């Protein structure tokens, strides 16, 4: 899959900033030893493509002692097979078993990080499922869930309310790749790099996705970085967030919520940050 170059650059910059922040903290602590109270700050580390066990160890050895407030981890849901970073952005179910670790390891990471005052932010993929990177016909995800990227059948997204999971009717009807970013409808209803585009206006899709967010919250996640939000209708994203907030019994505005929108003045006004 050819992900936009701007995303790769943004990730690299964010990672560099995170590393730079960590380098600076010990120096400050040495200069002001009386301030070593490890009070919760707003420092955030992006642990891009790090395993859950690695993050857990870093929380204990570095992030907690240095006063880091949040660690953002890569998408925790099951995805297509492969070691490339972008495979994490092609979900085949919302099971918390991924190439970065099992559900048990994910929950243990959160527990270990919380114990030293660090909260977890999850990178969340709601815009799409799989694209042309997977072979035709039936395939299996990293946790063994079957899906068919040719026909748009993803039974792994099943919930108690929707036991059939996701089918082709749960995606937008536009099957072409996005090419005209000045056309808001095309950007939000056609396919990003060939990936099936969720019909985010659908009550069913909103219910399944808000259930996933609630599952993350119940596992201990306390922040959400929403991927590719410029490709989701604003009203749909708001509805999903409100459904999620209702399910966990909190005010939607109180949730730590980050939306990825890469601005470009040449693109449609409705998809700008």
Predicted segments with their positions:
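Active-site mouth loops of central-metabolism enzymes
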Residues: 43-54, 195-206
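Active-site-proximal helices and loops of the catalytic beta/alpha 8
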Residues: 34-45, 52, 57-64, 68-69, ...
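Short glycine-centered, acidic/aromatic-flanked micro-motifs in structured strand/loop junctions
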Residues: 47, 96-98, 228
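Aromatic- and acidic-residue-enriched carbohydrate-binding clefts of CAZyme catalytic domains
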Residues: 39-42, 79-111, 146-149, 153-199
């Amino acid at each position: 899959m050819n992900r936009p170059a701007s995303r790769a650059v943004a990730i690299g910059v964010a990672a560099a900033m995170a590393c730079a922040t960590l380098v600076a903290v010990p120096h400050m602590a040495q200069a002001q030893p009386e301030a070593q109270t490890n009070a919760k700050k707003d420092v955030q580390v992006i642990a891009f493509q790090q395993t859950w066990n690695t993050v857990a160890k870093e929380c204990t050895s570095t992030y907690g002692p240095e006063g880091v407030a949040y660690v953002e981890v890569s998408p925790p849901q099951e995805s297509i097979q492969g070691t490339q970073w972008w495979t994490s952005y092609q979900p085949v179910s919302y099971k918390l078993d991924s190439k970065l670790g099992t559900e048990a390891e994910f929950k243990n990471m959160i527990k270990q990080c919380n114990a030293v005052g660090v909260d977890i932010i999850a990178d969340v993929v709601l815009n799409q499922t799989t694209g042309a990177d997977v072979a035709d016909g039936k395939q299996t995800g990293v946790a063994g869930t079957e899906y068919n990227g040719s026909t748009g059948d993803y039974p792994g997204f099943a919930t108690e309310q929707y036991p059939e999971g996701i089918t082709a009717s749960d995606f937008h009807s536009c099957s072409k790749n996005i090419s005209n970013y000045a056309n808001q409808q095309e950007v939000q209803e056609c396919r990003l790099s060939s990936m099936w585009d969720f019909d985010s206006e659908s009550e069913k899709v909103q219910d399944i996705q808000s259930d996933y967010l609630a599952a993350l919250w119940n596992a201990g996640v306390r922040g959400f970085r929403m991927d590719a939000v410029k490709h989701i209708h604003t009203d749909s994203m708001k509805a999903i967030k409100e459904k999620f907030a209702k399910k966990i019994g909190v005010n939607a505005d109180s949730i730590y919520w980050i939306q990825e929108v890469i601005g470009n003045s040449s693109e449609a006004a409705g998809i700008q940050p």
